Amino acid sequence: GFFLLKGVKNEFVPPQDQSVFITRLTTSLGSSIESTDAVVLKCEAFMSARPEVARVYSAVGGFGGGEVNAAMMFITMKEPKDRPVAEPFKHRPSQQEFIAFVRKELNKIPGIERAGVQDLSLSGFSAQRGYPVEFTVRGPDWEKLADIAHALMDKMKSSGLMVDIDTDYQLGMPEVQIFPNRAAAA
């Protein structure tokens, strides 16, 4: 199905300027919640300093509480008529123009492993994380799945047609396993 879409020249549902979007931020695996928070504070400072932005709200640690290296920022922009003309723009930027700028700039902040931006006007058509296009790779062999997923991601990246390419498969997250001595605990 992916290759059939090459011939489609228009979007089924074009993005809308709703003056709101989400950024999903990731620091390196094994980062503490404190170090992730410190990096997110830098991202908040960048966003808050932008004259196009009305409000910034951040949540560190993921919504399940177990993703210490993940965060989300909810960005509310000023209404289109109230947005100033500010560098690097030569006009009042649309939400989509600003999103492209933010994606590039947030990925430059030290400590950010990945900054993806989600346009909420397109999120209602997805089954999983809310992006306009998502793929699910399934099978019984985890190693093969990881290899296939990374090969698919490499092809998507090299095409230059897609942004925010990511996987929710994270190999290498440090963990501690505790096995209680039931006899001693009794």
Cite the ranges covered by each PLM segment.
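A generic structural micro-feature
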Residues: 15-17, 67, 127
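Acidic, Ser/Thr
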Residues: 26
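Surface-exposed amphipathic alpha-helical segments in non-transmembrane regions
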Residues: 2-7, 22, 35-58, 69-174, ...
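Alpha-helical transmembrane signal-anchor/signal-peptide segments
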Residues: 11-23
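Acidic helix-start/capping segments at beta-turn-to-alpha-helix junctions
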Residues: 62-65
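Active-site acidic-Proline motif in GNAT/NAT acetyltransferases
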Residues: 29-30, 182
